[in-house]
Amino acid sequence: KSLLLSTFESLFKYGLRDFHGLEIESLWKDENTYQVIRLDFSNLKDFSSVEEFSELLDQYLLDTLTVNRLVSPIKTDKEGLRAFIGWLALQADNSVVLLLDEYDTPLTSCLNKPELFDEVRKKLWRLYAGFKQWDGAIRFFFMTGIAKFSQTSIFSELNHFTDISLMSEFGSLLGYSHQEVQKYFSGYLEQASFQLGIEKEKLLEELTLNYDGFCFERTATQRVFSPWSLLKFLNFPSNGFDNYWYESGGQPGVLLEYLKSHSTLKPEEYESEKQVQLDDLALSAKFSLLEDKVLLAQTGYLTIKAVRGTTVTLGYPNREVSVSMARLYAEVILDKKAINRAGEGYLADYLERGDLRAFVEEVNRIILGIDYQAFPLTSEASCRSALSIMVSSSSALITARSEVHNAHGRSDLEIQTDKNYWVLEFKFCREHDSQESLLQEAVRQMKTRHYGKQLAKCNLIRAAMVFSQKDRQFTRWAEVSG
């Protein structure tokens, strides 16, 4: 989004100066240049009171006017907001281009503080009302953000906005399509293929698995790569398919704080199918009614998978994001000290080495760090989900899938590493159940339903595991052969 604003800034400020030989050269018809004001509200997030926010906003707007040589650098006696609106009021018709990046950062910074949210909203209302009052001076206004909040008034004051967020015409605007990747990055793909020692087709498969899959439009037919992650990979292919999600701003701390009190971050929700109404994605929401699934879609953790009528199915776009989401879940079910001690990275090593005992013992050690009051493991499903989160967060090179179907049934958890393919079957032992009987039942189920046999070309490891509700540990396990 920020790169798009940079493109607009150059076009309106300098015309085609920076775009000779590019497709826009034949499409851009405006021969005039304009005073371009670019506001980046991602700078307005470090505050704990409305007074601190007001001071931040006023100083930022004054600095913007000063940097653009629109007011004297000598301190004005006006607050920054009044000075900015006053300047806009003096401009000629259609002479100003306003670009507002991350408009909602001040609001998302206080998602978990409703009273502060409301005070910040009122302060921003004055700015947006000024835009509306003097919109005759504005030739073009483009705004980006994550969430849409109806009480901010930007969607009512500026009610002549065209919201392109879910329009199919703009579905590939903020990402690279497969065709674009193969057309414009062919040389980079060949270099990466050579450095990694894999065929170009295999390289594209891995890139798709890791960085593709984002869908931003209501027909659910266009999918694009994350530009940041793809470009980082192409710059340093020797690093392999690293996870760049957090580098692209994919883990705002306030999101974590907000979601801690919502059901979406219960372990059993990690792999569940999530559905929302199309209007929930398309329309602005009241703060008090903001749905956590919608927020996760707006922040990129979930993307549109399918649209049937007015119902939207959401899911993780790719491995990079599903791993990042697993880490977000791990942040919640384990406190930070527990994460630092838990050693999820060891899980990846044990899975790669095929060491079942070490794997189970490490899982049990991590379980000790889970807050039982907040996240009790009370069923086979919750155990499966917790283990899936641990494994998925342990390495970007490991893929975990729950309830994988074959012709005879569905296994609990299947895990792909570089060398091994694990198939796990769980049983949940309540206080008066026989652990040994449950273990043998899981072994029989694994054998009679042939779990994993369709993957005979892989180094297959199959294991049955019993979780004791009383001990809160996996107390029985066995590798299944034959």
Where are these regions (language model features)?
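Mg2+/Mn2+-dependent nuclease catalytic core
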Residues: 117-122, 428-452
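Feature representing long, continuous alpha-helical segments
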Residues: 381, 385, 389, 421-424, ...
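Conserved catalytic cores of phosphodiester-cleaving nucleases, focusing on short active-site segments
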Residues: 387, 411-415, 419-432, 449
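Short secondary-structure junctions
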Residues: 391-399, 455-458
